[in-house]
Amino acid sequence: LRCRLGLDDTDHVDEGCTTSSFDELLSEIQEAMNCDILERRLVRLWPFAERRTRGNGALGAIIDISEKDELLLEKICNDWFDRLLIKVAGYPPSKIPVSPCLAISFDKAPEHWYWDAVRGYVKPENILRDAGNTGAILFLKNEISGVVGACAAISWESNTNSSWELIAWR
């Protein structure tokens, strides 16, 4: 079963890193179940967004899991997200509070989510509504801004003309 995961807005201007958080989630998934990570993605969102922190990027991945593991994947993601919320609750106060969102889709998501999010401002309320209508599973808290990047990360479709950015951190 092909699954798309997207994560955005787990970082603060002074601490945290969405890329590192996403890597922790993918490692946890790999340790708990038999899966193949087919593709990792970095989505650079519209650079003029009001709520951007540092790099204004969201992370995504496409993984293959056994159909019998669909509920296990949801449980792993739910438990991980609960721990993430505890972690980000300890971040210092900020004018731009974190707004973590983790998106899971077992179907293709509307590709315009990606194109809209990289080309201009997208109202989080609209994506939240659309995601609910497509069957995407969303983990979020009170602030919903992270839904834009998380959904953009699950909706991009690569093709033969796509380019890739190599990411490394230590």
Which functions belong to the PLM regions below?
Residues 3-170:
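Conserved mixed alpha/beta catalytic, RNA-binding, or beta-rich assembly cores of soluble enzyme
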